[in-house]
Amino acid sequence: MPANPFNGFTEYGIGIGLRIPHYRHIFEHKPVVDWFEIISENFLVDGGRPLAVLDQILAQYRVVQHGVSMYFGSTEKLNHDHLRRIKTLVKRTKTPWLTDHLCWGSVDGTYSHDLLPMPYTFEAARVTARKVREARDFLELPIAVENVSSYAEFHVSQMTEWEFLNEVVEQADCGILLDVNNIYVSSQNHDFDPFEYLNSVPAGRVAQIHIAGHSKFEKYILDTHDHPVIDPVWKLYDHAIRRVGPTATLLEWDDRIPSFDEVHQEARKAGKFLPQIEEALV
């Protein structure tokens, strides 16, 4: 993976999300996995089984933290109690970088527990970038923001989603967690060219890539993480890594979770694209 300041100058390969149904298999069979991604909020506790399991994983594998509730796009201040808990976990996992979503989801201390799309305005970009910088400085760790899937748009938007992403990461001087499936989902819902999106992303800021499956519901495509990756998403992934180089890639599978072996096998499909890129870079 091309080393850059947004992934802590580390080289990771292909990972999968650490999920409860797979704990027993992992501990009994000790499969060869490049790294696991954990949802930070699942481990913000003072003790008990979650941390005991995590410590067992950390003894054998590398881990990267992925958050779901920073809500950089919300107008209220960052929750510093939450940040302190995140920082405690960071010290435990030694994650080389931390990711969360480019979205909003809270108002006046009330949380939606959802990843809501942003209005693509210059003011929203300014507020969001300031909060990303604040979190990065507090955590003393590189941060990468993830593009979310969306099913609605704001009339007040002043730019495209990819222009907004670029505006935020430039102002925040942060990395990108490039979710290729989310780009595909949103492109189908909002009728834009996903390759134009990928071609606009600043390659030097991509710290990590997500791939996943999705579902169709009536006229919308939903980012459900409950199916294998479809061919059009693999084609986008291939295009993405040709632009950014071999990059830490994570398969998300969060619902209707099959066996560990099936998830692992699906994730390893990403590997067939990497040798081509590595040869091209020689």
Language model features: what each stretch is:
Residues 23-28, 154-170, 186-199, 261-264:
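Distinct, well-ordered alpha-helical segments
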Residues 25-31, 48-65, 81-96, 133-138, ...:
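Acidic (Asp/Glu)-rich catalytic clusters
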Residues 40-52, 71-81, 151-159, 184-191, ...:
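Acidic-and-aromatic substrate-binding clefts and catalytic sites of carbohydrate-active enzymes
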